[in-house]
């Protein structure tokens, strides 16, 4: 049995899970998330806990039981507390603002970048150089943050660019004659 799948996932108050043949749906105060399932994992709900087990003795089923348990745990956390990712803009004239369902970025190009946000994702700009991306789906929040960062990754000589708030950019030394 997978070491991760040994531990059950507890459902907090206000969160409910429904298991069908090929998918699991988790509903909570922040929304509803759906995850497709394979036949390799058995999920049982009892007394506010979800337990996971491999359906057979194959290595693939064992690995999938741990993977599905981790995905469902992230879904439960997402619909109850939510996830957020913070980005920081470093550079002269680099600015960000939220315009409806999009983030407007000024990153030193000749044009402004308008990044549309997918459904269920919200963005805030507490200051002109900070972006906070929030949502219930951990994978989508991380993907949106990575897409925004990819417009202007931090360069290694001055550190200018879009970086995660907890990211450390190693600054290289310039060439010397």
Curated annotation (Swiss-Prot):
Alphabetical UniProt keywords: Ribonucleoprotein, Ribosomal protein, RNA-binding, rRNA-binding
Pfam families: Ribosomal_L6
GO annotation, biological process: cytoplasmic translation
GO molecular function: rRNA binding; structural constituent of ribosome
GO cellular component labels: cytosolic large ribosomal subunit
Highest rank taxon of the organism: Bacteria
Subunit structure: Part of the 50S ribosomal subunit.
Similarity comment: family membership: Belongs to the universal ribosomal protein uL6 family.
Database matches in NCBIfam families: L6_bact
Biological function: This protein binds to the 23S rRNA, and is important in its secondary structure. It is located near the subunit interface in the base of the L7/L12 stalk, and near the tRNA binding site of the peptidyltransferase center.
Protein name per the record: Large ribosomal subunit protein uL6
The organism of origin for this protein: Bordetella avium (strain 197N)
């Amino acid at each position: 049995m997978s070491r991760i799948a040994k531990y059950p996932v507890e459902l907090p108050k206000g969160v409910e899970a429904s298991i069908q043949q090929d998918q699991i749906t988790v509903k909570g105060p922040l929304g509803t998330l759906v995850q497709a399932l394979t036949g390799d994992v058995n999920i049982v709900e009892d007394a506010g806990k979800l337990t996971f087990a491999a359906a057979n003795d194959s290595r693939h089923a064992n690995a999938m039981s741990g993977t599905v348990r981790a995905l469902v745990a992230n879904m439960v956390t997402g619909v109850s507390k939510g996830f957020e990712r913070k980005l920081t803009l470093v550079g002269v004239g680099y600015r960000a603002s939220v315009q409806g369902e999009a983030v407007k970025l000024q990153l030193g190009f000749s044009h402004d970048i308008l990044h549309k946000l997918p459904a269920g994702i919200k963005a805030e700009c507490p200051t002109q150089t900070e972006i906070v991306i929030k949502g219930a789906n951990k994978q989508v929040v991380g993907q949106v943050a990575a897409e925004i960062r990819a417009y202007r990754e931090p360069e290694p000589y001055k550190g200018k660019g879009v970086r995660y708030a907890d990211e450390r950019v190693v600054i290289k030394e310039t060439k010397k004659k």
